Amino acid sequence: MRSRKGKLYSCLLGSLLVLTTVSAPAVAGFSFGKTVTLMQFQDMHGHLAPHAEIFPDERKDPNSGGIAKVATLIKQVRASNPNNLLLAVGDTTHGSAETTFSLGDAIMPALNALAIDVFLPGNWDFGYGPRVYRQRFVAGDYSTVLAPNNRTTVAWMDGRPGHEGQQCNTPGGLNATTYATCHVTKANFPAVAINLYNYNEVARAITGQTHPGYLVKNVGGVKVGIIGITSDVVPQQAQAFNTGFRFTMGYKELPVNIAAARAEGAELIVVLSELGLAKNIQLVREFPAINVMFSGHTHERTPEPIIIKRGLFGSNIGIVTEAGEDSFLGRLDITVYRGRITGYNWQLLEADSSVPEDPAIKALIEQETKTFVAGPDHICHTFGPNGFPFGKGHVLCDPLETVVGHTNPTIERFNVLEEVANNVMVDAFLDLALSLGETDSRGNLLTSDNTLSQTNGFRFDVVVLGSDDGFSGDITLGDLYDYYPIGATGALAEFTGGRLMDHWEGVLTNVFDPNPYRQRGGWFLGFTHNMHFDVELNDDFPRTITQGRIDLVTINGKKLDKSTTYTLASCYPHGNPVDEVCRTTGATNVRYVVGTPLGSGPTDMFGNRPLNISGPWYTQPPVNSANIFDPVRFANGGPLFLQVAPFNSSHPVDALRRYLATHVVDAGTHGLGRINAVTGIPASEYGGPGIVQPTQGAGPAWLKREFVLFDKD
């Protein structure tokens, strides 16, 4: 646990201007103002049970995190100061096998038991599609009917505790089309977002805000205005995530909502933002009315708060914090006098092995997850991909604790350029592709000279402790879903080297843009063992605004040829245009990797069995290749999305299981070195050496956004 106390100067106007030194507050016994405690609960990513973690002091702990440990910390904080708020910052209901195969419902009883005061949705809270999102988070919306593929995923919950009376699987069986009684669990806490709008896809018109932009809470006599800014990157994710919504960055809406909260008497303005640390720091610099910024999305950890000094002698400050994932709880004790911060104390509390699980929350989790682990309650589950008919999808039958591989080095995702976990993933995709005996559209056999793979720069993960560090090194099936909890399918597609290079340059620009408002997405991509990158991130390397960070790319030792066509083995997010693979558009000769279901063993409730990891594997073309998304067709009674990938198409976890059955994760094979930052990665301007993604980006100073108060669009 780290603590940072603040000492501020408060300007009091009387007959003379007086400067008064104010010491840092304690929760009790401080007389100069009123102290409220704000808790930052952030980026849970569906982590229900404890897991391994690496803490900022490099300590490796095998029993950390999980919502029940965080609940214990929340109770301890509440006991120390009754004047508190629990503020949840996004990406909560998505990120694990249990949440994927329940559309987030597995975590909802525990979340509803925490007494969250205000919730801000993150980009992955939209990951099950707009119908699930509206049912769960939009107050008063009980009429939205789940899509057939959604009902496939949650049909197993019919009649279980908390789902009494739910009818997702009856009447109608495989012929079911609509169920007004099929639903996901409703959140009992309010959501805020100034930048999320309802959108009529047919009329192409905004129809109002989805949530209130802010709420004002009276906490021990201090009125706190809590404003929400959800993630602005949802439109760049799978198309099915944002249908019926429109997102802005919130820049224009922010001053309006600040003024409205102030008009309701708010003395303290707290912004919950899923824009990421760099954007959020810039907002605090440009909007002096923001007192506290609880930042999310980028998974950074700030053991010490980032303080933005403004006003005379720095008397007006903005406090920016980010509290990692579920292994932490942020605590900010803040003292306010006449609408001014007179002191603060920030602690990044650690949910490590010394913190017990809250018994009541643990019992809720065990109830929701018992069908996923070995025992009498274990069953098969099915995730229905977008566009699939009811009763079809990706089948999970093995318990999540099943050991599926071994790692020598410790695995995590916490590096802006390259990670062992991503290297393993793309090597698994490539290995499967090369095993198929396929040829490309020109008749060339797929080899490591003409075939490659990439994976998105995801941040969600769990730490898997390796045998090199004295631990078992076991990789479980649940671990694999923590690294790939989305319902994509394996795909092969062809791109020119020039198209791939343009995409990679664009991603590097998104990650390292010197203008924080142009930073977006996750971290950089993962690439296969037959690839090598030299990238230049320093300020003086010649480049244009969008090109020039990549100095060299080789495939099997040969320089990438922009005119040559390569085969990319990667993922297809269901519902996207057919020519888009792994967020790279312009694909040709797209086909999907399909497996063979097991011939015996358990089935899901629809009679489906999981794919045989041993094969055989082959490819099939798209089921549909045009007009995949059509809101007019939907308005006339047809499907909003068409099925693209065939039945029995592979999931990335299938490729990983196949690969790990014959390969040990090893630093020599999967270690860092595929991406070489020739001049290094610059240290972050804000937040200290522990910040993974430099907040100022990397590149020429002339590309930066200058700090101008009251800047206009």
Tell me what each language-model feature is:
Residues 2-12:
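Bacterial N-terminal signal peptides that target proteins for export
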Residues 14-17:
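Sec-dependent N-terminal signal peptides of Gram-positive bacterial secreted proteins and lipoproteins
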Residues 19-26:
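C-terminal segment of classical bacterial N-terminal signal peptides
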Residues 29-353, 424-431:
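Acidic, metal/ion-coordinating pockets
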Residues 32-41, 46-79, 113, 243, ...:
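Catalytic centers of hydrolytic enzymes
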